[in-house]
């Protein structure tokens, strides 16, 4: 067969000739590519010299042991601490010192809160003493005073009070739990425990600050708000140390007051009350985090200004209520002079205490303030001008007006002493427990 044979016997090229627009009719013994080889893109002579891809290269590096991050595989309740592996690529099973520092701060806070609880305990004791007309000194309690205290404790704990119980304060302090159980089998242990609480309200408070050294009050500019608040509480605690360290020695070594609790065995309770100094309330001492004291009202300022001149006996007397009708009966008579309400008590008096005193004498002061519901502690100010005038006379302030007095009332909302009743009425307020007793 020759080159010009039948078309069916010829094999044409699959693509046009280079630089030609017509199909070649020449028979060729080989198949041509669709495009000419580009040496710049692909060199046929370099096929055997192609560089391998990095991923295809054999690994000649030494094999390293695999480190697993055990941070998330540890038990949640494990007592050790794993430090951040970004900082150190090791496992640290020692306790982080920062945690220990945090625990120390928590301990300091617990001590502060413990002191706050003791302060409230002292206030509750003083309230009960004023309510029952009890002297501040256990050693001055007569058998009638002891009977009042026992009956009050039985009422608080729903116990059946004993009959014909005449025990003086000195005898109470010397009674053991078995002695209490003899006079009250069903609740003698409760009365004995409550007596120890009353002792703790005085002795533990003194011991809490016996060895406390006031810190430097200068604060750094970089102190956080939380640190500033803690520092203010610490300074408040420090302010009480100088007062408690000035207590005198025992006046009567034959009657130790704190011998039951192991503190100050040579100090009688009377010397404690006479030589001690009133301590400011924490709610009155705290200021805002920026150091301002704009929330201080007239009632609070009086408390701070009179701290150095007011004895601890006045603290017990004034932190509770004013002289109750029971106290007036014990003293023999109840005066009719209006000025008696303003002169019979020395030391600092809070506004809420003053209002309670007026409420307890409705015959003289019902035109000024009266009870709306005695059981609920709701009262109404009938004459704000008259109340402000009486309060100004009590505080010896001729410029006292109801605007200043109302600021003190509003401060009591924050302190949990007074609030507006659910059904709001003008000049109607409500004492909150335990101030409504």
Swiss-Prot record:
It comes from the Eukaryota. Residues 21-30 have a biased composition (Polar residues). Disruption phenotype: Delayed larval development and increased lifespan, but overall resulting animals have normal morphology and fecundity. Reduced egg-laying rate, but older hermaphrodites produce more progeny. Both decreased expression of genes, such as the lipoprotein vit-5, which is related to life span regulation, and increased expression of genes such as lys-7, which is a lysosomal protein. Reduced expression of genes such as svh-2 in response to axon injury and as a result, there is reduced axon regeneration of D-type motor neurons. Residues 280-293 have a biased composition (Low complexity). It comes from Caenorhabditis elegans. Disulfide bonds: none annotated. It is found in: Nucleus. The gene is ets-4. GO terms for molecular function: DNA-binding transcription factor activity, RNA polymerase II-specific; DNA-binding transcription factor binding; RNA polymerase II cis-regulatory region sequence-specific DNA binding. This is Transcription factor ets-4. Transmembrane segments: none annotated. GO terms for biological process: cell differentiation; positive regulation of axon extension involved in regeneration; positive regulation of transcription by RNA polymerase II; regulation of transcription by RNA polymerase II.
